[in-house]
Amino acid sequence: MRLIAGLCLTLAATLPAAAQTVLSEASGNWAGTSGEGFTFLARLTHNEDMARLTIWGGGPGSSAVAEGAPQFDNAEIALGAFATLQELTVVDGSDGSVLQIVTEYADEEGTGRIVTDLQFIDNQFTVVGYFHAGEHLGQGFECDVDLWNMIATENGQQRQLDPVGFDALNASDWTWDAAYERGFCTRS
């Protein structure tokens, strides 16, 4: 009997874990249009009511692949519940690439679109921008946050945000409502 139990445990340990549904993948080069930096492969997967972002890195001149331990893994970076669209996009610029997490959602109370911008800066996955617009209970709203310049524009009104340390913009603990929790956007 112990032999069977041991065999079952061994078999269970060697089987792969249940795969999460892949929602979107994107790849690029953190150096942007020059293509002379580190490459990356980003994957957005379904994780219960949230979306998980996982990023693997590659060296200059070699493609990143989804093997081994990822450089970045945040299991709750974006909203998953009520999502009608979830995708990753890469915006290449002369100053580097921005990885965008795009979520569109709809429920009985409203609709909206959230875009979170990430860059790899000084060995940190950094949130550099956040945009949330939509309608809630018949009332429209919009919040656009430029974390490079610490400026938030809410419903057409611009305000200067208090400076924060570099670590405060680390994407590893960013969640779908972090911009509200940290005071970058306000709830009306």
Positions of predicted regions on the chain:
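Sec/Tat signal peptide C-region and signal peptidase I cleavage site
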Residues: 15-19
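Bacterial N-terminal signal peptides
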Residues: 5-14
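Beta-propeller blade termini
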Residues: 21-33, 80-96
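A low-complexity, Ser/Thr/Gly/Pro-enriched, surface-exposed linker/loop concept
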Residues: 66-81
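Short, surface-exposed coil-to-beta transition loops
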Residues: 38, 50-52, 110-115
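Acidic, small-residue rich beta-repeat scaffolds with periodic aromatic anchors
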Residues: 96-188
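Beta-propeller blade repeat segments, especially FG-GAP/WD-type strand-to-loop junctions
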Residues: 51-69, 117-122
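Acidic/hydrophobic-patterned starts of short beta strands in beta-sheet-rich repeat architectures
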Residues: 31-45, 54, 92-105
